[in-house]
């Protein structure tokens, strides 16, 4: 896939889809390795990162373990993007996910 930067795993179809949506489900890892999934509103940045509010449990978890994932999808027609990466706090109660891996479905003809 070609993305917005040389290291980005997001192709143009994924970027276009992420720009068209606003809500995803963010997965963080809590103490003891317990997964925690919460809906978040996100914003796609110019470099292909995703910014979102991070407070409470999300902030605690990603500060201790920055590896996170987000899924953005729709059900009719079924399509979506799953992104795995590393999150960092960029402002008070604001974090940025830098994608390392991405998977998509239903975004291209025949997929």
Question: Which role does the model predict for each range below?
Answer:
Residues 17, 31, 88-90:
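Short alpha-helical scaffold segments that flank and stabilize functional sites
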Residues 22-54, 70-72, 82:
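Short beta-strand segments
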Residues 55-103:
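Short, structured beta-strand-loop surface elements
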Residues 2-3, 12, 27, 69-82, ...:
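Hydrophobic small-molecule pocket/channel-lining residues, especially in calycin-type beta-barrels
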Residues 1-7, 91-111:
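C-terminal edge-of-domain segments
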Residues 19-23, 64-66:
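A short, compositionally biased
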Residues 1-20:
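Extreme N-terminal tail/first-helix region
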């Amino acid at each position: 896939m070609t993305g917005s930067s040389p290291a980005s795993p997001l192709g143009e179809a994924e970027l276009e889809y992420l720009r068209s949506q606003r809500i995803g489900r963010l997965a963080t890892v809590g103490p003891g390795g317990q997964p925690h999934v919460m809906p978040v509103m996100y914003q796609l940045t110019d470099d292909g990162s995703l910014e979102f509010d991070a407070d409470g449990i999300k902030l605690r978890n990603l500060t201790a373990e920055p590896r996170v994932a987000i899924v953005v999808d729709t059900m009719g027609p079924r399509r979506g993007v799953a992104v795995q990466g590393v999150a960092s706090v960029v402002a008070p109660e604001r974090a940025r996910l830098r994608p390392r891996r991405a998977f998509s479905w239903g975004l291209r003809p025949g997929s």
